[in-house]
Amino acid sequence: MTKSSGGGKCPIMHGSMTSEKKTNTHWWPNSLKLEILRQHDTKANPLDEDFNYAEEFKKINLEELKQDLKNFMTDSQEWWPADWGHYGGLMIRMAWHSAGSYRLADGRGGGGTGNQRFAPLNSWPDNVSLDKARRLLWPIKKKYGNKLSWADLFILAGNMAYESMGLKTFGFAGGREDIWHPEEDTYWGSEKEWLAETKNRYSSDEERDSLENPLAAVQMGLIYVNPEGVDGNPDPLRTAKDVRETFKRMAMNDEETCALTAGGHTVGKCHGNGKEENLGPEPEAADVEEQGMGWRNSGGKGVGRDTMSSGIEGAWTTNPTQWDNGYFYLLFNYEWELKKSPAGAWQWEPIDIKEEDKPVDVEDPSIRHNPIMTDADMAMKMDPDYRKIAEKFYKDPEYFADVFARAWFKLTHRDLGPKDRYLGADVPEEDLIWQDPIPKVDYSLSEQEIADLKEKLLNTELTSYELISTAWDSARNFRCSDFRGGANGARIRLAPQKDWHGNEPEKLHKVLRVLEDLQSTLDKKVSLADLIVLGGTAAVEKAAKDAGYNVTVPFAPGRGDATDEQTDVESFEPLEPLHDGYRNYLKKDYAVPAEELMLDRTHLMGLTAPEMTVLVGGMRALGANYGESEHGVFTDRVGTLTNDFFVNLTDMNNVWKKADDHYEVRDRKTDELKWTASRIDLVFGSNSILRSYSELYAQDDNQEKFVKDFVKAWTKVMNADRFDL
């Protein structure tokens, strides 16, 4: 851009929309934040509309890609030289920190989207120097282009780092699609500063399992725990509690946790040979000439042995570029004492260590340094339960390698979803329970057979309410965050779902009994999962017909029925619907307003704001509220798929009044009570954005559009977990 000579006025108004403007949220902080639902909008995605990542990934010569990554590991670059000439440790840390932000509570975080490229993760204190790891990989990403997502590359790079250092990994699956902007739905904590004291997210400082839900890290900006100890105070037994709780929140048991801790620290090193004040701003705060990188180090050479990342300095093992059992050898054969790193961080170092057991310097093999352990590493020795596991691993290296390889695969694939989404030749054949396996079906249904089944379902003793609500309950716990839940598998009939309060166990038991009886009379095998969805679909179709619209609600057979043996009860507990605005359900009163809870569920279901609106209006008209509650059922034609909810919501002849724990809809002139409503019902008339959608569906010329849009959104919910379609 060429400057003209002489001064001139700024070409934009100061305080423009591209700088520090006051947002609507600033002026009205309690307004409903619908932005999280816009993440499902594809406008920010620069790829062609018909781009299919799965098809592109299949074009990759996977063996060539893996060899490229192996060659890359030892191709040290002068601008960011590899420790001991091998990038393995750096790539493993990058992959780990990509996948390790996953939490079981809501399925968010994790390595499934390449989110490490964007704020806040790209600038977290725990991710110092990972900007360099990503830039080092750019030539490989550039070569493979659209066929290889950043998200898949991060994980595969970690895999190949281990392979290149001697570990046989359990496998690899592609299929992670990149996002193109920061995620707005993920709650990382309420703190306003990095590494704020843990008291900010624990209800009790002593009870280390009181970490705020859904968080799975002890401090803002960390992946798991503070490596120096709780709040930077070394105490391995106390740190063990943090390790156990944070890994539990990622669905890891003690054995997996110990294996991951040891295996992750068998290779690579920590970097703290300098002063923290020598580091420049993080990527998001760095100047434009840094080109998206940050933490420029002004100390010494700023790279190599002078690298600064965590502040802890040293390698864990004697041979940090080789997979072996050296971690346990050093941990158990030496006593360890607390020391300070050159950067002033707490670390554990061995007492009277043999010279040959020390790792060599990253630049000069004639120099040796003490190995180190973090407080979390010492927890593996000092916590009695972890110690038993660690001793077993020490005595049986092959067992350790197998447990670690499986745990690493779980860590890096947990949020990829079921195996139907896995891509590539290295997908393990073995089904693992955390993948929520579902048996494949061996039947198909013709259109006539589907029509006959619909008729049989409608002729059972089940009401439309029972059919629709059960189908909805079966499908609604799908999460687009980690692709778990949904109607496929019919797990609504198994523990724990069959007993969830929100699934109305008594009603559910009746519905399942009737459907199982019908299933036993059919001429051909049809899964219960298909019958549950088809029952709701048939009832919706009938409700549309009763409203005067002959529409066919799409139905795709092919769902299987999972078994108890294929279901990890404990890991399904977080999927329990404690709230569901679509059925006007709250298990109890929560500090968070019901409408905000609904937005969270809507996002996890992969729905947009218009889809949410049409579904709520339709479910109210169908009378599908929890327990057949009348809140929000603004119609005299309950069970008919009409737009009455929107017509009456926007009718200025009505007035809304607070009454105890609900609202009353009264005639503006006579004060006659017409209906009752919840906060969720009223928000579709009070929020300006949602009201615009409500007005659209209330229009006289949009009654048919309402029916068609409801059917489309209903079908999307029913098929959300059908990755085979």
From Swiss-Prot:
Gene Ontology CC annotations of this record: cytosol
PTM notes: Formation of the three residue Trp-Tyr-Met cross-link is important for the catalase, but not the peroxidase activity of the enzyme.
Active site: 97
EC number(s) on file: 1.11.1.21
Top-rank taxon: Bacteria
CDD domains: catalase_peroxidase_1, catalase_peroxidase_2
GO BP: cellular response to hydrogen peroxide; hydrogen peroxide catabolic process
Cross-link (Tryptophyl-tyrosyl-methioninium (Trp-Tyr) (with M-250)): 96-224
PROSITE patterns tied to this protein: PEROXIDASE_2, PEROXIDASE_4
Covalent cross-link site, Tryptophyl-tyrosyl-methioninium (Tyr-Met) (with W-96): 224-250
InterPro entries (alphabetical): Catalase_peroxidase, Haem_peroxidase, Haem_peroxidase_sf, Peroxidases_AS
Protein keywords: Heme, Hydrogen peroxide, Iron, Metal-binding, Oxidoreductase, Peroxidase
MF terms (GO), sorted A to Z: catalase activity; heme binding; metal ion binding
Family: Belongs to the peroxidase family. Peroxidase/catalase subfamily.
PANTHER family to which the protein is assigned, alphabetical: CATALASE-PEROXIDASE, HYDROPEROXIDASE I, BIFUNCTIONAL CATALASE-PEROXIDASE
Record protein name field: Catalase-peroxidase 1
